[in-house]
Amino acid sequence: MTDIATDAPRAHARIIYLGPVSPHWEVYGEYGERTVLEEFRTRVLARLVLLTRDDPQFRRNRERIVRDAERERISIEWDLGYAESD
């Protein structure tokens, strides 16, 4: 057992890879406060704007985005255009 309380997410965002031609990414807010989602979207796009999903920097920035979402209590869903294996 852990003493960590898991709070419900404040918002949900989908991060979608659009393809190899810029812009590569789009972020859609599914639910939650609009300002929270807009600020999160701005940070996500700043990290991904010039990266394709195959760029080595993408993996590091993806982990940073996941940590940011956890801090902000935003659940995220990635659509990279292929099935991911964990």
Question: Where do the PLM segments sit?
Answer:
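Short N-terminal "domain-start" leader segments
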Residues: 1-26, 35-39, 44, 56-86
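Solvent-exposed strand-loop boundary residues in beta-sheet-rich modules
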Residues: 31-33
